[in-house]
A protein has these predicted regions:
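N-terminal capping/linker segments that flank leucine-rich repeat
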Residues: 4-8, 13, 19-117, 134
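Residues on the solvent-exposed faces and adjacent turns
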Residues: 95, 122, 132, 143, ...
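Consensus "Asn ladder" position of solenoid repeat domains
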Residues: 101-102, 123, 141-144
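Canonical leucine-rich repeat
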Residues: 106-107, 128-130, 149
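Consensus positions within tandem repeat domains that build extended binding/scaffold surfaces
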Residues: 119, 138-140
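Short, intrinsically disordered, charge-balanced linker/junction segments flanking boundaries
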Residues: 148-155
Length: 155
């Protein structure tokens, strides 16, 4: 009887650990607990790009910008899915929302499964790549310095 109870307790402990492992960080990702790793990594790459004065996009969007804390990344509205994972749902980097920010570089939003809108008009972004975003129904990338723009497999 003791052995059966021990096995049951061990199994219960395994099931309690499993969701934590699924939400945990991979060694190569710095994504905080719960955030979808590839979304975090791709947005972080954009936030860390610097303009000619050496100012990061993240700092342009928020004076409280902390690369390790997505809640400080201006212009992104997060969605907590029933699974517990945190996705980017709305991204607004346009000059209408953040005047005189002049964001630069490339923005890759491929595989953002919960993304519904992107607004990044009026900046100096040179490339935007969006694919496999089935919920995306609003997109405004006007008045940028785009040399590369691609959209595929979106709503």
């Amino acid at each position: 009887m003791k052995r059966i109870i021990s096995v049951i307790l061990a199994a219960m402990m395994l099931f309690m650990i499993a969701p934590t492992a699924a939400h945990g960080k991979r060694a190569e990702s710095r994504a905080p607990y719960g955030y979808v790793e590839h979304e975090y990594d791709q947005l972080l790459a954009f936030m860390e790009q610097t303009n000619s004065a050496g100012v990061k996009n993240g700092t342009q969007l928020s004076s409280a910008y902390d690369p390790n804390d997505p809640e400080t990344w201006g212009g992104i509205f997060w969605y907590i899915a029933p699974t517990g994972f945190i996705h980017a749902e709305y991204i607004f980097f346009s000059t209408y929302d953040f005047p005189n920010r002049n964001l630069v570089g490339t923005l890759n939003l491929s595989g953002f499964s919960k993304l519904r809108a992107l607004g990044c008009a009026g900046n100096s972004i040179t490339a935007v790549s969006i694919s496999d975003c089935p919920l995306l129904d609003e997109l405004n990338v006007a008045q940028n310095l785009l040399t590369n723009f691609s959209v595929s497999n979106c709503a």
